[in-house]
A protein has these predicted regions:
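Bacterial N-terminal signal peptides
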Residues: 5-15
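N-terminal hydrophobic alpha-helix used for membrane targeting or insertion
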Residues: 9-10, 37, 163
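Boundary at the C-terminal end of the N-terminal hydrophobic targeting segment
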Residues: 16-19, 24
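Short acidic, Pro/Gly- and aromatic-enriched capping/linker segments at domain boundaries
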Residues: 25-42
């Protein structure tokens, strides 16, 4: 058995650098022009000389990128032995990728990228172990493979899937809707849906979604801000119901940098709007979707992060409020007094990455000692035990539903290629659902050990 270590990568890098057998002087890197921009944050002036490089559509930026690429190639192409290393790394990096499924109705939706495909493909299974069926293949949408599948959201029953595509890495998606059974593309399209958040109504008739403004609707330069929440009703003739007529639900008059997301309760009554304000603060708003009342803020306005889910009239909130490693609080939907919130799962030594109600249980993901942990709780906060993982490694996605007795999680490690496992809530058994094949790697030939060392300040 061989021990696997990051030292392998250091030795590989050293071998590449040592292989440079050219004595010629490398070309000079391109010089980026300095164009000072000064921002004032909390009374402190911050100088940014390279703000202009953030505009990827600027001819000046594109010219600099071309020069930088030429410089990079001038360095890398001189390295002897590079072709052999490139070949082996290509083998290792071309095993593809896979995502945890999203469950809707009796369907299982997930993405997979095979080998050197430019874009992942959206597949659907109509039963647990049924055949995979291609639903959206972004690779077929352009000759050069540069149209990306950015995101997707199945409707509650899985009848439809809303998905976003964008060209050439722009990420400014256009929303499309496909019928799962037939593959028919509906006429509804919505532009400017970058990184969209979508919440379908339970009857598949429409959805709440986020959208950015058109040019001219906001001051110049603000088009990548002012993300608002709208509602769209499906229609057979979008000319009779253009996106511009979709009613605005949330965002008017708020900070242009707000980043709202949406979700609906399992009974379809409550719309939860989660508003990211930078990297350290989140606000939660709740709207009675049946009564169509204005959204009500339920958080305190303090500098904490919150993420929530409404199930059977209760709001389950994951937060770092007075808990830097996060905890779960619970409150009654409709009663937003902060004093009525109760702690359901206290913070622990591990850092909680998230929690969700699946199969009538709380499924919580933690990270400790650079490795993932999965734990189950009942809805009163009682610990029910851990979900055993295949090895020391990382859970990079999960999926489930409030009305299904199964949970899926995506797992990978140094020796495990990306794999999707299914946990049966009734039996407590875990099984492999699907995985990425890595034929050039033999996991049995390696061992993975986690070693600890003491730093200068005494920290282990």
């Amino acid at each position: 058995m061989r021990s696997f270590s990051a030292l392998v990568f250091l030795l590989l890098a050293a071998s590449v650098l040592a292989a440079d057998d050219s004595n010629s002087t490398p070309p000079a890197p391109p010089k980026a022009a300095e164009k000072p921009v000064i921002d004032i944050f909390h009374g402190t002036k911050v100088l940014d000389n390279y703000r202009w490089l953030e505009d990827g559509n600027s001819p000046e930026t594109q010219k600099w990128v071309e020069q930088e690429m030429a410089y990079t190639r001038g360095i890398l192409d001189r390295l002897a032995g590079r072709d052999a290393i490139h070949k082996r790394l290509t083998e290792l990096l071309s095993i593809g990728s896979i995502s945890a499924p999203i469950l809707a109705g009796h369907h299982y939706f997930y993405t997979r990228r095979e080998g050197m495909q430019n874009q992942p493909v959206l597949y659907v299974r109509d039963s647990l172990n049924g055949p995979d069926r291609v639903l959206v293949d972004a690779n077929a949408l352009s000759a050069d493979g540069t149209i990306a599948l950015d995101w997707y959201y199945p409707s509650e029953t899985g009848k439809y899937v809303a998905y976003g595509t964008s060209p050439s890495g722009s990420e400014m998606s256009t929303l499309h809707i496909i019928e799962t059974k037939t593959g028919r593309i509906l006429p509804d399209t919505i532009e400017r849906t970058r990184a969209a958040s979508i919440a379908w109504k339970l009857d598949n008739s429409g959805f709440y979604y986020t959208r950015y403004p058109k040019k001219g609707e906001v001051p110049a330069g603000q088009e990548m801000y002012n993300r608002h929440v709208y509602y769209h009703e499906l229609t057979n003739d979008p000319e009779d119901h253009p996106e511009d007529s979709d009613p605005l639900i949330f965002g008017q008059g708020r900070d242009p940098e707000d980043w709202p997301g949406v979700s609906l309760s399992n009974d379809g009554r409550w719309l939860l709007i989660t508003v990211e304000q930078g990297w350290t603060k989140t606000e939660l708003f709740v709207m009675d979707a049946k009564a169509n009342t204005p959204p009500t803020r339920i958080t305190t306005g303090k500098n904490f992060r919150y993420n929530g889910e409404i199930y059977n009239g209760k709001i389950f909130i994951t937060t770092n409020e007075d808990a830097p490693r996060y905890r779960v609080l619970v409150a009654e939907a409709g009663n937003y007094e902060r004093e009525s919130w109760k702690e359901l799962i206290p913070q622990s030594d591990a850092v909680m990455q998230g929690a969700a109600v699946w199969g009538g249980k709380l499924f919580a993901e933690y990270e400790q000692n650079a490795s993932s942990q999965l734990k189950l709780f009942d809805l009163e906060g009682k610990a029910l035990g851990d979900v055993a993982l295949p090895a020391i490694g990382t859970v990079y996605g999960s999926g489930g539903r409030w009305d299904r007795d199964e949970i899926f999680y995506a797992f990978q490690s140094y020796m495990f290629a990306p794999s999707i496992y299914r946990y049966d809530l009734k039996t407590g058994e875990t099984s492999l659902w699907t995985k990425v094949d890595a034929p050039s790697i033999d996991p049995a030939a390696y061992e993975v050990h986690q070693e600890w060392f003491q730093s200068k300040d005494g920290t282990r």
